[in-house]
Regions:
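Conserved catalytic-core segment of nucleotide-activated headgroup transferases in glycan assembly
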Residues: 21, 167-251, 261
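Hydrophobic residues at beta-strand termini and immediately following loops
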Residues: 164, 187, 302
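Proline-centered loop/turn at the N-terminus of a beta-strand
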Residues: 105-106, 139, 160, 213, ...
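Extended catalytic core of nucleotide-activated donor transferases of GT-like folds
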Residues: 4-9, 15, 22-27, 32, ...
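Helix-loop-beta element that forms the nucleotide-linked donor phosphate-binding surface
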Residues: 149-167, 176-177
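Anion (oxyanion) recognition and catalysis
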Residues: 30, 100-101, 108, 206, ...
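Catalytic binding pocket for nucleotide-activated donors in carbohydrate/polymer assembly enzymes
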Residues: 7-15, 21-24, 30-31, 37-45, ...
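Short, solvent-exposed loop/turn segments at secondary-structure junctions
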Residues: 9-12, 42-46, 88-91, 113-116, ...
Length: 354
């Protein structure tokens, strides 16, 4: 197939969890023989932090404006068998309208932020999607599964809504040998709504356990945050360094944004990445998680700092290795780029011809 992605960013992972997802997907699709073009808005904050300026798979095109995108890539969109518009694309409504009008093949909205999208649609926020556009896509690929799929169909008229969870590239995310530097680590960009959970599960645990070491990696954390002395801060970890970063932790913490926790069935890309690196994961609790991983066998669930403290103190090396190994096996079986590409191919094939 000829496939065009109109996505947030594939060239920069700075503050952008979409990047590793897109990279793995484009790499796998290209490897399966598809002709893939990724169009990305050239914005200063990504331009200054490009860790993959020229992706080696498919083609990548940068554009400065919607007008430039239309002028230079109308033929690509019109000729594509599949056009995928992603969430959080700058001027996404205008781009989606143009893509839907121009495309002659299958169209899909790839929502890597489904609960946030629903909140925006209900609140009249047209940052990257509008309610009237939802039914016009042939496919709605949702980061979130569970009851949210019915909401998209019944409340917004979406067609062929499918749970299209985040994915991991097993060649990029794999176990590596590294000295254990931290007892618990977290990788993620700062978010106002996610910070209370990070404070509850990591910062408070660090205060209770000054003899242990912790790390929080990611950009945009405000300077006024009071970090305990045993919490190390790292501004950015490039994707190529993620496996070594994870391997340097005894446990990795997964924290979910409130909208996604409320919706449930919203596994993050970091969750799959750390599991693929065979590091045991401690996660906050949300509905549907038990369908992604078997609790206590493939993942540990914490509601408060005491839970985390107990896991760190009571889970032996052999037990944690077994948990990590089982989680990696589950990810490799169900959540790789190969599995998602197979799913995408099936879904596109099932869309009725225009």
């Amino acid at each position: 197939m000829k496939i065009v992605f109109l996505g947030l960013s594939i060239t920069s992972s700075w503050g952008n969890g979409h990047a590793t997802n897109y990279r793995a997907l484009v790499r796998e699709l290209s490897g399966r023989g598809h002709d893939v073009l990724f169009c990305e808005r050239d914005v200063p904050w990504y331009a200054e932090n490009r860790d993959l300026p020229r992706p080696p798979w498919g083609r990548t095109a940068l554009y400065d404006s919607v007008e430039q995108l239309r002028a230079e890539h109308a033929e690509d969109v019109a000729a594509a068998d599949l056009v995928v518009v992603g969430s959080f694309v700058p001027e996404g409504v205008a781009i989606a309208e143009w893509a839907l009008e121009t495309a002659t093949g299958t169209t899909a909205f790839y929502d890597i932020d489904t609960p946030v999208t629903l909140a925006k649609l209900r609140g009249g926020d047209r940052e990257y999607l509008a309610p009237d556009l939802v039914p016009r896509f042939d496919l709605y690929l949702s980061f979130t599964g569970g009851p949210t799929l019915e909401v998209l169909e019944e409340e917004f008229g979406a067609h062929r809504v499918v749970a299209f969870y985040c994915l991991v590239d097993p060649d990029a995310y794999r176990p590596v040998a590294a000295e254990k530097r931290w007892d618990l680590g977290y990788l993620g960009t700062y978010s106002d709504d996610r910070q209370p959970a990070l404070k509850r599960l990591l910062i408070e645990t660090a205060r209770r356990a000054p003899q242990l070491s912790f790390v929080v990696a990611g950009p945009q954390y405000p300077p006024e945050i009071e970090w305990p002395d045993n919490v190390e801060r790292i501004e950015h970890v490039a994707p190529g360094d993620h496996p070594a970063f994870y391997a340097s932790q005894r446990f990795s913490l997964n924290v979910t944004r409130p909208e996604m926790r409320a919706a449930g069935w919203s596994p993050s890309v970091r969750l799959f990445e750390s599991a693929a690196c065979e590091v045991p994961v401690i996660s906050d609790r949300w509905e549907g998680l038990e369908q992604i991983f078997t609790v206590d066998e493939e993942i540990l669930i914490a509601d408060c700092a005491q839970d985390v403290f107990d896991f760190l103190g009571e889970t032996g090396e052999e037990e944690s290795a077994c948990i990590a190994g089982r989680a990696r096996e589950r990810v490799l079986a169900e959540h790789t780029a190969e599995r998602r590409c197979e799913q995408l191919e099936r879904e596109v094939e099932a869309v009725p011809a225009r």
